[in-house]
Amino acid sequence: MNKIRKGDEVVVLAGKDRGRRGAVLRRVDDERVVVEGVNRVKKHVRPNPLKGEVGGIVEKEMPIHVSNVALFNPAAQKADRVGIKVLEDGRKVRFFKSNGELVDA
């Protein structure tokens, strides 16, 4: 079970975008995530008339390592660590380690 999932609101802990908040757009693999509005780079795109693509400079988000982000805790209004526990009915759920509140209600 992944501690950071698509759609989660996260805070960047390290790098040029430290302190910025954004939603996770997708997980690239087990170790990297793409966060909305974070780690934006300019890519030079060659025109491709077969696909109808116009060339130029495109700004897009690039993946960052999952260790450089933390889940945003709305109750505490800060980044927080996440743990995983098994409930009585056998379901695995994520919880915030600072206050024990469940992430997945």
UniProtKB/Swiss-Prot annotation:
Record flagged with keyword GTP-binding: no
Highest taxon of source: Bacteria
Molecular function GO labels: rRNA binding; structural constituent of ribosome
Swiss-Prot/TrEMBL GO biological process terms: translation
Keyword rRNA-binding: yes
Keyword terms of this UniProt record: Ribonucleoprotein, Ribosomal protein, RNA-binding, rRNA-binding
A GO term from the CC aspect: ribonucleoprotein complex
One Pfam short name: KOW
Gene3D superfamilies registered for this protein in UniProt: 2.30.30.30
Matching InterPro entries: KOW, Rib_uL2_dom2, Ribosomal_uL24, Ribosomal_uL24_CS, Ribosomal_uL24_KOW, Translation_prot_SH3-like_sf
Family: Belongs to the universal ribosomal protein uL24 family.
Function: One of two assembly initiator proteins, it binds directly to the 5'-end of the 23S rRNA, where it nucleates assembly of the 50S subunit.
HAMAP family the UniProt entry points to: Ribosomal_uL24_B (MF_01326_B)
Assembly and interaction partners: Part of the 50S ribosomal subunit.
Name of the protein described by the UniProt record: Large ribosomal subunit protein uL24
Species of provenance: Azoarcus sp. (strain BH72)
Chain's gene name: rplX
